[in-house]
């Protein structure tokens, strides 16, 4: 049996692929791309929420948001570590993101204009992430799957926190209710775009499904999110900004309108509202953090020298 046949057999038998196992170069490259983009999304995703830490309406909300942003940083580090098991350096893939050669989730290129946006990000954006990431707990690459188990537990808390914040607004004044509806109007369609292009326009999906890196198609995950979320919107007394949305009794699913794929392509190609601002912020943080990285490396080298001596 060849190495490739043994690899295919492990995939078919649902046996996790580990870093020391042989794997095709294309499998390795696909994972580096996906895990790297996932890690970048966690790190860039700190920015729109961090923007509201000092402006949160209460001390409780401030503490919750601060903890959430810290969690996102941790998720990024887990994922960079998982990517490193594939033989890449985190500095290299991070620099590719700063240079615009690797992408992150399009949702983080939209501004957070009100406090309601923060609640809606926790509820809708993290809710969409959970739908995608729960399936990744069974991805074929072991380190990625294990990282996702911990991340999904924390993301579930984030989603509940976001929904609770939205519920408080939905039970508030007319101005608060309108602020919540405005936030839903802004983030509903970008949340649907998070699952990526339609299946017939997704060049990487087929191979990822064959290798069980992905377990479901983009459209299957998007449909699951809509089915989960529309009843929650209605429970809050809000409206989904989609005149074509309706429940199909025959299929048991909600049917929704056409996504603006031109907007999606503009954003992922660097022409969104906040693309440049997000990358500028990350470049600034990287440059200003040089002394921290150098100090940490020097400390590690001293510790190693003491052990050797």
Curated annotation (Swiss-Prot):
InterPro entries: Aromatic_CoA_ox/epox, Ferritin-like, Ferritin-like_SF, PaaA, PaaA_PaaC. The keyword Amino-acid biosynthesis does not apply. One of its GO terms (molecular function) is phenylacetyl-CoA 1,2-epoxidase activity. Keywords: NADP, Oxidoreductase. The keyword Transcription regulation does not apply. Forms a stable heterotetramer (dimer of heterodimers) with PaaC. This is 1,2-phenylacetyl-CoA epoxidase, subunit A. It comes from Escherichia coli (strain K12). The lineage of its organism: Bacteria, Pseudomonadati, Pseudomonadota, Gammaproteobacteria, Enterobacterales. The gene is paaA.
């Amino acid at each position: 049996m060849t190495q490739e046949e043994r690899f295919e057999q492990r995939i078919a038998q649902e046996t996790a692929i580990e870093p020391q196992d042989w794997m095709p170069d294309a499998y390795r490259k696909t994972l580096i791309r996906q895990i790297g983009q996932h890690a970048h999304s966690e790190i860039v995703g700190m920015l729109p929420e961090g923007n509201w830490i000092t402006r949160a309406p209460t001390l409780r909300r401030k503490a919750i948001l601060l903890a959430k942003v810290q969690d996102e940083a941790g998720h990024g580090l887990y994922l960079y570590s998982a990517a490193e098991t594939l033989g890449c350096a985190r500095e290299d893939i991070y620099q590719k993101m700063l240079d615009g050669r690797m992408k992150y989730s399009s949702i983080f290129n939209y501004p957070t204009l009100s406090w309601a946006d923060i609640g809606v990000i926790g509820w809708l954006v993290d809710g969409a992430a959970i739908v995608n990431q729960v399936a990744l707990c069974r991805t074929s690459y072991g380190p990625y799957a294990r990282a996702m188990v911990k991340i999904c537990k924390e993301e579930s808390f984030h989603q509940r926190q976001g929904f609770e914040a939205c519920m408080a607004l939905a039970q508030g004044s007319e101005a608060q209710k309108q602020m919540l509806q405005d936030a839903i109007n802004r983030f509903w369609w970008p949340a649907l775009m998070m699952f990526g292009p339609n299946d017939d326009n997704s060049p990487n999906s087929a191979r990822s499904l064959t290798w069980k890196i992905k377990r479901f198609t983009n459209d299957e995950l998007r449909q699951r999110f809509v089915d989960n979320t529309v009843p929650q919107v209605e429970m809050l007394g809000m409206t989904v900004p989609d005149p074509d949305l309706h429940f199909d009794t025959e299929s048991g699913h909600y049917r929704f309108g056409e996504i603006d794929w031109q907007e999606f392509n503009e954003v992922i190609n660097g022409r969104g509202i906040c693309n440049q601002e997000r990358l500028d912020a990350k470049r600034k943080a990287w440059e200003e953090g040089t002394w921290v990285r150098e100090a940490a490396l020097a400390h590690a080298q001293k510790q190693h020298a003491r052990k050797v001596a």
